[in-house]
């Protein structure tokens, strides 16, 4: 069977679902997950989300993040993370995530890891679950986004050294999905670095 979409997204964690929600509503999007849509590491994450406290906090946020990564991070990527963090948290709030508030009704920022100031927003001790549930609800309300659960991404479809889709296996049936764009949001990024013994 062949299927044609504008965007094929492999993975239903925060990266995959948030990507789907940030695409143009006119695009036909297919999100593929190997299990149920809620069976992701996002759902299991307990901590919070780092966010710059304001424009003046961005340089310190960048430095804290670089230091935590032993300066192996790509500086440009860390700068984007820091600069866009406030807008992304606002968007998550607009989608319905109810981050914890302090006694004055403001976001309750906590401190984790290598951060030198309180800049972590959270929902109790189940931030990942809250984010996942909100994103799943939002994706399910978008008519241009289709979800394939219990579906395996087997391989990419390549033509002239360019990815033009993916081969899926669903209910023992092969589905060739042709897409203008393919987003691999499969998790496990931390495992791609060669480890050293110290």
Each model region followed by its residue ranges:
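Short secondary-structure boundary/hinge segments and terminal tails
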Residues: 40, 83, 108-111, 156-158
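Residues forming the flavin
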Residues: 1-65, 101-103, 124-198
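Rossmann-like flavin
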Residues: 69-108
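Helix-loop-beta segment of a Rossmann-like dinucleotide-binding subdomain
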Residues: 71-75, 106-133, 190-192
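Catalytic phosphate-handling regions of large nucleic-acid enzymes and associated NTPases
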Residues: 99, 112-114, 155
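Short alpha-helical interface elements
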Residues: 54-56, 73-74, 86-90, 113-117, ...
């Amino acid at each position: 069977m062949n299927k044609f979409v504008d965007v094929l997204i492999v993975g239903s964690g925060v990266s995959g679902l948030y990507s789907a929600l940030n695409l143009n509503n006119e695009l036909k999007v297919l999100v593929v997950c190997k299990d149920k849509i809620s069976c992701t590491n996002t759902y299991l994450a307990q901590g919070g989300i780092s966010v710059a406290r304001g424009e003046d906090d961005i340089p310190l946020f960048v430095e804290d993040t670089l230091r935590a990564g032993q300066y192996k991070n790509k500086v440009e990527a860390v700068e984007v993370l820091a600069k866009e963090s406030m807008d992304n948290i606002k968007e998550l709030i607009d989608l319905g995530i109810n981050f914890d508030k302090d006694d004055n009704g403001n976001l309750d920022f906590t401190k984790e890891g290598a951060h030198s100031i309180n800049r972590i927003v959270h929902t109790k001790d189940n931030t990942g679950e809250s984010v996942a549930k909100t994103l799943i609800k939002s994706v399910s309300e978008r008519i241009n986004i289709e979800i394939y659960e219990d579906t395996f991404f087997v391989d990419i479809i390549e033509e002239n050294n360019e990815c033009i889709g993916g081969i899926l296996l669903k209910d023992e049936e092969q589905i060739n999905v042709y897409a203008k764009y393919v987003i691999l949001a499969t998790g496990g990024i931390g495992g791609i670095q060669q480890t050293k013994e110290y």
